[in-house]
Amino acid sequence: MARYRHSRSRSRSRYRRRRRRRSRYRGRRRRYRRSRRRRRSRRGRRGYYRRRRYSRRRRRRYYY
């Protein structure tokens, strides 16, 4: 029983590590966007955000 529990926790940790890596990358990009938002105009920012959102969705489809 102990061996089964250990193997299960090992697989779960591997899954969590992969998720954390992606989330950290996304957080860094969000901070970059926030710093850039102040410089851009209101209309330009909206167009930029829309383009980023589309690209992210496309990449996600490619991932899975």
UniProtKB/Swiss-Prot annotation:
It comes from the Eukaryota. GO terms for biological process: chromosome condensation; sperm DNA condensation. One of its GO terms (cellular component) is nucleus. Keywords: Chromosome, Developmental protein, Differentiation, DNA condensation, DNA-binding, Nucleosome core, Nucleus, Spermatogenesis. InterPro entries: Protamine_P1 (IPR000221). Belongs to the protamine P1 family. Protamines substitute for histones in the chromatin of sperm during the haploid phase of spermatogenesis. They compact sperm DNA into a highly condensed, stable and inactive complex. This is Sperm protamine P1. The gene is PRM1.
